């Protein structure tokens, strides 16, 4: 039996609320509701949001399309955090609007690194000629 203090990953409720918050943030960003020159110049993707166990903190992982100007975009989102929080509160029915944090999404970089690794000569040599031909 698992002890209550052990971390087993996010609960179903955390995942459901995280997805609602993700949709709300993405909608605000896509509609251009924020009056910020940095944000208006970029299309920003929000691939993931993670909620704290008490649902009072949401960490949004964001990436500008094309991967350019990541740091200025994150800084602009942090500057507009209060407005975004109000918009999330309007769109998501929760007792408390979660505080928002923004982080750079590194999953694209990690996937590219793994892809480069799998395509490297050393790995291809280890896989042998049968793997390359799909046999």
Swiss-Prot record:
Name by which UniProt lists this protein: Ribosome-binding factor A
UniProt keyword annotations, A-Z: Cytoplasm, Ribosome biogenesis
Family indicated by similarity: Belongs to the RbfA family.
Subcellular location: Cytoplasm
GO terms, biological process: maturation of SSU-rRNA
Taxonomy, superkingdom: Bacteria
Alphabetized GO MF terms: ribosomal small subunit binding
InterPro entries recorded: KH_dom-like_a/b, RbfA, RbfA_dom_sf, Ribosome-bd_factorA_CS
Organism of origin: Methylobacterium nodulans (strain LMG 21967 / CNCM I-2342 / ORS 2060)
Quaternary organization: Monomer. Binds 30S ribosomal subunits, but not 50S ribosomal subunits or 70S ribosomes.
